[in-house]
């Protein structure tokens, strides 16, 4: 686990933080659910909830275009529907339509300016579009609005590392650790950067502090070994 996971996986993580389905199913069960909800839609008057649920099933089955089409139906009737804007942006990222994702996320933020997941998602989309400074500006604003979010600091640290702003990235990893002291992900990302910079003793101190905070030493064993080999 290192900070590169944020760039690759952040959209996936934040998109399902507020997922309107609260239970787990396997593929065949999702298909059964999709069949059932299609029947409900065919037999019922218009229901935004039914169409949002259908789109969610499409996404669980990785039917991204079907999901996009379903959210479009909702947005024709309710252009300011936050869930439809957010999840259509998410589906479009899987289709690599990053401009469309950006448009939906900007529209959502015009409606809900503090929407945390939308802000993080937009920062990732901007990076995919090669607009890293805009992405950094978005993360700076997000941290101002959500100063107690370890995830926001970690996302900014990852981008700062890509931009070779290593010292400020180290600060942000430290803040992420302070806000989520028992999360090993932030620890190993912090240590990984220290090792890249050749600061092996400092990396070991970070590991020792994490163990004192209650993170099992075994979870960090690989990183302890790396500090030994690189001294």
PLM feature segments, named:
Residues 59, 86, 93, 127, ...:
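Position-specific recognition of the canonical hydrophobic site in helix A of tetratricopeptide repeat
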Residues 21-65, 69:
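N-terminal leader/linker segments that initiate helical-solenoid repeat arrays
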Residues 27-36, 62-73, 94-107, 129-141, ...:
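Structural signature of tandem alpha-helical TPR/SEL1-like repeats
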Residues 48-49, 82-83, 116-117, 150-151, ...:
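Helix-start (N-cap) detector for alpha-helical repeat units in TPR-like alpha-solenoids
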Residues 28, 196-231:
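Terminal, low-structured helical/coil segments at or just beyond the last alpha-helical repeat
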């Amino acid at each position: 686990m290192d900070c590169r996971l944020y760039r690759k996986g952040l959209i996936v993580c934040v998109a399902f933080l507020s997922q309107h389905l609260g239970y787990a199913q396997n593929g065949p069960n999702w298909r059964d659910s999709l069949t059932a909800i299609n029947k409900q839609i065919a037999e019922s008057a218009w229901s935004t909830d039914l169409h949002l649920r259908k789109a969610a099933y499409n996404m669980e089955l990785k039917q991204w275009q079907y999901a996009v089409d379903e959210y479009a139906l909702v947005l024709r009737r309710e252009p300011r529907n936050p869930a439809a804007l957010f999840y259509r942006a998410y589906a479009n990222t899987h289709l690599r339509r990053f401009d469309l994702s950006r448009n939906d996320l900007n529209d959502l933020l015009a409606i809900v300016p503090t929407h945390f997941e939308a802000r993080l998602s937009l920062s990732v989309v901007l990076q995919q579009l090669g607009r890293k400074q805009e992405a950094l500006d978005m993360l700076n604003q997000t941290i101002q609005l959500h100063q107690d979010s370890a995830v926001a600091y970690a996302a900014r640290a990852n981008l700062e590392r890509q931009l070779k702003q290593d010292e400020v990235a180290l600060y942000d990893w430290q803040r992420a650790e302070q806000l989520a002291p028992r999360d090993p992900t932030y620890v190993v990302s912090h240590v990984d950067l220290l090792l890249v910079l050749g600061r092996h003793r400092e990396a070991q101190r970070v590991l020792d502090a994490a163990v004192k905070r209650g993170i099992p030493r075994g979870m960090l064993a690989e990183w302890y070994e790396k500090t030994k080999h690189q001294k």
